[in-house]
Amino acid sequence: ITSISQSSSYGGQVAKYGGFATLEHILYFDATESASGTELWAYSPLNGTYWMTEEIRPGSAGSKPGSSTGLIPMSGKLWFNAEDGTTGSELWSYDPTSGTAEIVADLYPGSSGSSPGVFSGLVPISDRWLLFDADDGSFGIEPWVHDTLTGQTSLLGDINPGNSPSLPGYLLPYKDVGNHIVFDASNQTYGTELWAIDKTSQNWEATMVCDIWQGSSSGQPNSGSDDPLVIGDRIYFSARDQAYGNELWSFNSVEQTCTRESDIRPGSQGSNPGSVSEGFHNIAGMIAFSANDGTTGN
């Protein structure tokens, strides 16, 4: 469509960090050229024009928009992480109406940056909330939410107390399931297990909903598959326990219970469901996935 950089050194460096996103018929992407480095650009297919939306980080270093979050369109704005050279990597937004970009929250004061979305990405929920992981320098890497309606950014819990990280959403990214937002997180007491936020609660706070492998060992929800599956008020995912190994599990948002749905491979080795089928797939109301029963292979 166009050549943004006139230098062969930067050729092909389009959508390298944040990918592509569309908002109100405009295509947004990160692009690199020698004078401003990597910044947020836009292209209009209506008139064939392209432009740099804003130079968030002045100079040739570039802000690398979307490097950990991607570019997320929601509520009439574009949301992403960026580095302005002063605050480090933080959450930003771009408003196409005003044509300006602004920092949403400086969660880690100073130049270090909170590095939002490194493990979970930036996940839009119900066209209002943005869920992500971040490190504010006090609590370690924990779950955060930004409410695009109120403009508030809040910590959802110190799951792993102190400055140790809980790595929320690392295995099972934030998923909207009924009245809950479900994800995995880790602490020293329970290991890596399934956690949730009740969207109907006045004050959102993360709580553990299932200790699949009881004690400090980890159930590792969704560790063996690429993508869990949400059907109605349930989410299906792989998880392991001491007796059955890695098998198919579900969480019921209404009853707030976890259930092992199968023992495909008897014994503690497990069938590793979804490991080679890119997770679980809804086909006419049935869940299709790969598994190894120990006899026929995957």
Identify the meaning behind each predicted range.
Residues I1-N298:
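Feature 14080 marks short, conserved micro-sites in well-ordered regions
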